[in-house]
C-alpha cells in the first residue's frame, strides 16, 4: 500500500490483536519499541505468532521496509499492562511501532539510516492522520508503568 506521503507499506499480518475495531478518535498515542532480538526474522515471527501474545501495528526492518502487521483501528498487543497518568491499558489508545534492533542484551547497534528515514515518514503520517498531540508523544520504557 502506498500512502499519500510516499510511504510504502508491505502487508504481513499478525493475528495478535483485539476486536472490535476502535474509533479513529480513540488513538491518542504512538509508542515506539525496539525488538531486542538478534535476528529480524525471529522478531517478526514472534510478533505474528499467536502463542507469543505480542504484536505491533508496524515493524520497521533494518533495510527500512515498513511492514503493517495490525490494521490501525484494531488494538495491537505491544504495551502490556500499562498506564500513563490516569489512563490504563495504553494498547487501547495507541499505535505500536517496533524497530528491529538487537538491543542491549545482544550488542546494541545504531539504527540504520534507512530505519530512521522510515520512522520519520511513518510518524509524520500517523501524527497527522490521528492528530496526535505533542505532549502525548513519549518513549515507552521511560514513562509507562
Protein language model annotation of sequence segments:
Residues 2-131:
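Active-site-adjacent loop/helix surface patches within enzyme catalytic domains
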Residues 129-145:
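Acidic/histidine-rich, metal-coordinating catalytic segments
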Amino acid at each position: 500500500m502506498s500512502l499519500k506521503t510516499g510511504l510504502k507499506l508491505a502487508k504481513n499480518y499478525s493475528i495478535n490483536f483485539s476486536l472490535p475495531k476502535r474509533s479513529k478518535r480513540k488513538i491518542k498515542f504512538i509508542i515506539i519499541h525496539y525488538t531486542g532480538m538478534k535476528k529480524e526474522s525471529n522478531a517478526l515471527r514472534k510478533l505474528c505468532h499467536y502463542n507469543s501474545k505480542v504484536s505491533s501495528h508496524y515493524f520497521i526492518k533494518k533495510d527500512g521496509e515498513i511492514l503493517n502487521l495490525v490494521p490501525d483501528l484494531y488494538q495491537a498487543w505491544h504495551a502490556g499492562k500499562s498506564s500513563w497518568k490516569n489512563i490504563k491499558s495504553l494498547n487501547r489508545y495507541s499505535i505500536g511501532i517496533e524497530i528491529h534492533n538487537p538491543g542491549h542484551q545482544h550488542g546494541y547497534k545504531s539504527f540504520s539510516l534507512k530505519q530512521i528515514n522510515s520512522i520519520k515518514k511513518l510518524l509524520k503520517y500517523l501524527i497527522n492522520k490521528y492528530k496526535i498531540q505533542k505532549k502525548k508523544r513519549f518513549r515507552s520504557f521511560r514513562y509507562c508503568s
